[in-house]
Amino acid sequence: ALSAAEAEVVAKSWGPVFANKDANGDNFLIALFEAYPDSPNFFADFKGKSIADIRASPKLRNVSSRIVSRLNEFVSSAADAGKMAAMLDQFSKEHAGFGVGSQQFQNVSAMFPGFVASIAAPPAGADAAWGKLFGLIIDAMKKAGK
């Protein structure tokens, strides 16, 4: 889990993203797909589709809203070790079942702080705190065999 201070920094930087969650969720997913062109293939709805087709797809909002909601749960529980352990266990098993591994979350971790900063200037320490949060997800994926 994150320390209380780390969780607070993550929550403060997440606030502006979540305030416009629909558009920001869509924009993040498109940015991920542009940065890592193999990423759409991990989503049944987007496998083999072009960025233009994904952007025009009514499924984009469905997928991005699920991701934003799940990330919001992690942000809300970041300092609660018990909740985080249970959530990470379930999340990692679920995603391993989808064929998603730690590398995909390393990709997200590499670009997410910059995405957050593109929406609103994050508080000091936000990049490191997001890195720690995604590090927990990456470690859970590795434990799940991915």
Curated annotation (Swiss-Prot):
Domain Globin: 1-146
SUPFAM superfamilies linked: Globin-like
Coiled coil feature spans: none
Keywords: Acetylation, Heme, Iron, Metal-binding, Muscle protein, Oxygen transport, Transport
Keyword Heme belongs to the record: yes
Residues engaged in binding heme b: H95
N-acetylalanine modifications at: A1
Pfam families: Globin
Any one Gene Ontology cellular component term annotated for this protein: hemoglobin complex
Keyword flag Transmembrane: no
Entry GO MF terms: heme binding; iron ion binding; oxidoreductase activity; oxygen binding; oxygen carrier activity
Recorded family membership: Belongs to the globin family.
Subunit structure comment from the entry: Monomer.
Further information: This molluscan globin lacks one of the heme-binding histidine residues found in most other globins.
Descriptive protein name: Globin
Taxonomic classification: Eukaryota, Metazoa, Spiralia, Lophotrochozoa, Mollusca
